[in-house]
């Protein structure tokens, strides 16, 4: 499949963030439209789908893949790109429109959480080359490789990040779910 040069492949993660953050997609889409951005978007369906969708976009020739979500969605998108069959993966730009809870990656790069700034940065081709590391591990069934941008969690961190997303939120406070999650066997 051939994609017109400059067209973005956008992955919207509706599970990222709070309900207020989840409702921002309409505003983000309207802002991109008002700026004349050429894009196709797909919505993730659940755990693991961001990775799969990013791989599909990379394999279909998108050279700019934008994630509307948080740190978890960004990490999954990086894994999808790196695990894809796309040629010249190092030339694929990944953009982030912060729309999650932590957004640590965006904060690290001094991107405020206002989506307009993020869209404008991507439009203006504001890029930084970053290292992508990887970790090989055995998950109890098979050997795996996971990629990560500039930071990695190990031990209870990744497990405790995953559990709240799999459970219903209570009063929109992930902290309560996180505390309960840490007492589950790993």
Residue ranges and their predicted role:
Residues 58-59, 76, 83, 186:
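Alpha-helix boundary/capping detector
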Residues 1-68, 79:
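ATP/NTP phosphate-donor binding region
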Residues 50, 72-77, 104, 130:
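Short glycine/serine/threonine-rich phosphate/pyrophosphate-binding segments
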Residues 45-48, 69-72, 100, 155:
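Short beta->alpha linker loops
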């Amino acid at each position: 499949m051939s994609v017109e040069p400059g067209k973005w492949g956008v992955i919207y993660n509706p599970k990222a963030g709070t309900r207020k953050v989840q409702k921002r997609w309409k505003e983000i889409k309207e802002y991109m439209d008002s700026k004349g951005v050429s894009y196709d978007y797909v919505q993730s369906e659940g755990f693991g789908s961001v990775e799969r969708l990013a791989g599909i976009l990379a394999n279909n020739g998108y050279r700019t893949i934008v994630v509307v979500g948080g740190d978890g969605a960004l990490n999954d998108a990086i894994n999808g790109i790196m695990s894809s069959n796309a040629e010249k993966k190092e030339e694929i730009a990944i953009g982030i429109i912060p729309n999650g809870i932590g957004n640590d990656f965006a904060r690290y790069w001094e991107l405020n959480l206002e989506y307009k700034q993020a869209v404008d940065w991507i439009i203006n081709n504001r890029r930084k080359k970053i290292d992508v590391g990887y970790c090989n591990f055995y998950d109890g069934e098979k050997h795996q490789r996971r990629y990560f941008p500039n930071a990695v969690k190990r031990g209870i961190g990744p497990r405790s990040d995953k559990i709240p997303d799999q459970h219903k939120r209570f009063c929109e406070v992930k902290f309560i779910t996180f505390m309960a999650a840490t007492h589950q066997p790993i």
